[in-house]
Curated annotation (Swiss-Prot):
PROSITE patterns: SOMATOTROPIN_1 (PS00266), SOMATOTROPIN_2 (PS00338). Keywords: Disulfide bond, Glycoprotein, Hormone, Phosphoprotein, Secreted, Signal. Belongs to the somatotropin/prolactin family. It comes from Homo sapiens (Human). This is Growth hormone variant. It is found in: Secreted. The gene is GH2.
Amino acid sequence: MAAGSRTSLLLAFGLLCLSWLQEGSAFPTIPLSRLFDNAMLRARRLYQLAYDTYQEFEEAYILKEQKYSFLQNPQTSLCFSESIPTPSNRVKTQQKSNLELLRISLLLIQSWLEPVQLLRSVFANSLVYGASDSNVYRHLKDLEEGIQTLMWRLEDGSPRTGQIFNQSYSKFDTKSHNDDALLKNYGLLYCFRKDMDKVETFLRIVQCRSVEGSCGF
């Protein structure tokens, strides 16, 4: 084959490959509504697991006097995640932008990746369906990825790593005034339920603002 013909053939093949790449990048992305549906499904699942496990643990092990004393003492009821600035009421929540609410939700999820593994024995003994430390951790990681994807889509689509919650729960635990293992687990479950409720609420608000017809569901 002549050199000129070979060059022309290679050029044509290169242009064909380029057109394939361009077509591949033009594939439609996952609809925003589906991304929100997936994130909300995981958030609801996490909250339900947190709520059911908390209720089960409280009924089985915590006396009413202990519960009252725990909740009334700001030192024992202090949640590790309270170091994350979150809106304290509905009005302040509504004043936050979509990205702010997603960032807060992301940090709350990341804050539980370490301490949820300390509840291994609690989840192992729980009768709540799906309540194992591996399942809960996987749900947290899945939701972390889902929220990061939503943040990427709601911004300009440029790659980003997102904020990372890198404080250590173990440092907080060493300063804890609660040395009783039973009450320590109770406190973790109390805070886990509280934070998963926040995440679900924040995601629901952002979904309502971003996806037409999604409010109220």
